Structures are given as structure tokens and as C-alpha cells.
Curated annotation (Swiss-Prot):
Annotated HAMAP family: SurE
Record's protein name: 5'-nucleotidase SurE
Cellular localization per UniProt: Cytoplasm
Root EC class: hydrolase
GO cellular component, as recorded: cytoplasm
Pfam families: SurE (PF01975)
Function: Nucleotidase that shows phosphatase activity on nucleoside 5'-monophosphates.
Coiled-coil residues: none
Keywords: Cytoplasm, Hydrolase, Metal-binding, Nucleotide-binding
């Protein structure tokens, strides 16, 4: 397959480099285009008010200077390359993209951007203990890469254009994974309050509070799958219409 690979942790992150290596070893043609720095939680932000610069780092490797994940995929699918791609893969993200995380996630946003050319897309995340955006533990990126290799043939068989799968993989050895579950997005409680402090010069600064804990995490959710050592696979789409409210709202107005 001809695969476009991006992420939000940056070109030099271990996750994307591990996945690129494994996909190429499996015989896939992989073009990597990723931000030159960490752009976690950039969501679908696009750079519109200034020019974008792209650096070529290898035959099929590129970084976008100060770009976002959505910038990377948008550029790749809209004229930067002459190549025709079969699939967009985003990841391996260093941390979870569960429940409400997908709204903010640059990893998921890169996959969503693949819909422009009706391409199926995968957003892949490794879920372990996390603090301040960094994973702690064994960091089994090889496990997540193998899961992607397991899923790819099945995705081809589905033959569904614009299908987006949000995949979260437990940070465990591959042999310890119990299987894969198709799930829905769970839900987190509201984030913790902001943290207020002062910089060395006495100016007030703020940090956003930590993610809320899972409150909708029952059987069938992505949170449940990860808590029980399963890979979570959630089909998602970009249509944000609240279809159930259309009739009620029409009658009210």
C-alpha cells in the first residue's frame, strides 16, 4: 500500500519513527510528513495567516516548520506530492486519545484530514501511564505498530472510503494483548481547574488543568477496552450534526 504517515508529536518522536520502520519492513511505501515539533492538542488547526515551509529530510520524509498535523496531511493531499495515496495513518501517539480527547487531538485531526480525498484513515495511540504529555513505563510502540499491521488487511477488505478508525493500544507486550474490541467513545468529566502561578519576573502565568477522569467508561466504550487490556477500535466521522435534535428544534422554531 502507498501510505501517508503523520502525527502530532513531531517528526522525531519515537512513535512515528517506529511505525514508519515497521510499515516499510512489511513492504509498504510510506511517505512521512509531520510537524517539526510537538503539536499535541492542536486539533484541526490550519495555518492560514502565514506561509508554510516544508523541509525534506529523506527520500520520503518531510517535516513542516511550525506546522500542525492537519497542515501536514492537507499539504500532502492537495498538491505537495504527485503521489496517489491509499491510506492515511496518524501516530503512533504518545498517550491516549479516548472519549472527549478526540475533539482536541492532533493525531485524530490528521486522520480526519484524510477524508478530503475519500481516503480511509487510522489514528493510532499508545495508552500507558501519562504525566505532562509524556508516557512512562515500557512504551511498547512495537505493539501498536503490530496492531496497525494486523488491521491494515481488514481495512482494505472493508473497502469503505472515508472510513476513520480511532485505535488505542494498551502499553503492553503484544503477547499480553487480549484482543481487539470495536467500541464507542466514552466520556470524561470536566478538566481540572487551571493552575495559576508566577514566572521568575513576577508575571502571572497559567497552566491548563489535567484531563478529567472517565465517567462514561462502561462495557462497550473505549475506556473499558483499555482498562481490560484490549485494543479499542472506534469508527468516527467528521459530521458533527446532532441529528436527533433536528426534528425537535424544527418544531420549536
Amino acid at each position: 500500500m502507498n501510505i501517508l504517515l503523520s502525527n502530532d508529536d513531531g517528526y522525531h518522536a519515537e512513535g512515528i519513527q517506529t511505525l514508519a520502520t515497521r510499515l516499510r519492513e512489511a513492504g509498504h511505501c510510506v511517505t512521512v510528513i509531520a510537524p517539526d515539533r510537538n503539536r499535541s492538542a492542536a486539533s484541526s488547526c490550519l495555518t492560514l495567516m502565514e506561509p508554510i515551509r516544508v523541509h525534506q529530510l529523506g527520500t520520503f520524509d518531510y517535516s513542516v516548520i511550525a506546522g500542525t498535523p492537519a497542515d501536514c496531511v492537507h499539504l500532502a493531499l492537495n498538491g505537495l506530492f504527485e503521489t496517489s495515496f491509499d491510506l492515511v495513518v496518524s501516530g503512533i501517539n504518545h498517550g491516549a486519545n479516548l472519549g472527549d480527547d478526540v475533539v482536541y487531538s492532533g493525531t485524530v485531526a490528521a486522520a480526519l484530514e484524510g477524508r478530503h480525498l475519500r481516503l480511509p484513515s487510522l489514528a493510532v495511540s499508545l495508552v500507558g501511564k501519562q504525566s505532562e504529555g509524556h508516557l512512562f513505563g515500557n512504551n511498547h510502540f512495537e505493539t501498536a505498530a503490530q496492531v496497525v499491521l494486523d488491521v491494515l488487511p481488514k481495512l482494505v477488505d472493508m473497502a469503505l472510503p472515508r472510513q476513520i478508525l480511532n485505535i488505542n493500544v494498551p502499553d503492553l507486550p503484544y503477547s499480553a494483548i487480549k484482543g481487539m474490541l470495536v467500541t464507542r467513545l466514552g466520556q470524561r468529566s470536566p478538566s481540572a481547574e487551571i493552575l495559576k502561578s508566577q514566572d521568575p519576573r513576577g508575571s502571572t502565568i497559567y497552566w491548563l488543568g489535567e484531563n478529567g477522569s472517565a465517567i462514561d467508561n462502561g462495557e462497550g466504550t473505549d475506556f473499558y477496552a483499555l482498562a481490560h487490556d484490549y485494543v479499542s477500535i472506534t469508527p468516527i466521522h467528521a459530521d458533527m450534526t446532532a441529528h436527533h435534535a433536528i426534528k425537535v428544534l424544527s418544531e420549536m422554531l
